């Protein structure tokens, strides 16, 4: 074990003085608050962007199965 002690100390040294940078987080409110209409549009765009492609794949699943077997 005495042979492994110096290499282990070399590997552990950088971990002891590891400094995590401080995040620059602002606690101020937004300059221009988003209206409920903007929030609704943003949410609907997010849902549509995820659901339309998956719906397309699910609706064409049978044709995908047929094309993969031939």
From Swiss-Prot:
Residues exposed to the Mitochondrial intermembrane side: 60-70
The UniProt record lists the keyword Secreted: no
Pathway the protein takes part in: Energy metabolism; oxidative phosphorylation
Domain of life: Eukaryota
Ranges annotated as spanning the membrane: 36-59
GO cellular component terms, semicolon-separated: mitochondrial inner membrane; respiratory chain complex IV
Keyword presence, DNA damage: no
Mitochondrial matrix side: 25-35
Subcellular location per the Swiss-Prot or TrEMBL entry: Mitochondrion inner membrane
Family, per entry: Belongs to the cytochrome c oxidase VIII family.
Stated role: Component of the cytochrome c oxidase, the last enzyme in the mitochondrial electron transport chain which drives oxidative phosphorylation. The respiratory chain contains 3 multisubunit complexes succinate dehydrogenase (complex II, CII), ubiquinol-cytochrome c oxidoreductase (cytochrome b-c1 complex, complex III, CIII) and cytochrome c oxidase (complex IV, CIV), that cooperate to transfer electrons derived from NADH and succinate to molecular oxygen, creating an electrochemical gradient over the inner membrane that drives transmembrane transport and the ATP synthase.
Quaternary structure, from the entry: Component of the cytochrome c oxidase (complex IV, CIV), a multisubunit enzyme composed of 14 subunits. The complex is composed of a catalytic core of 3 subunits MT-CO1, MT-CO2 and MT-CO3, encoded in the mitochondrial DNA, and 11 supernumerary subunits COX4I, COX5A, COX5B, COX6A, COX6B, COX6C, COX7A, COX7B, COX7C, COX8 and NDUFA4, which are encoded in the nuclear genome.
Name of the protein in its database record: Cytochrome c oxidase subunit 8B, mitochondrial
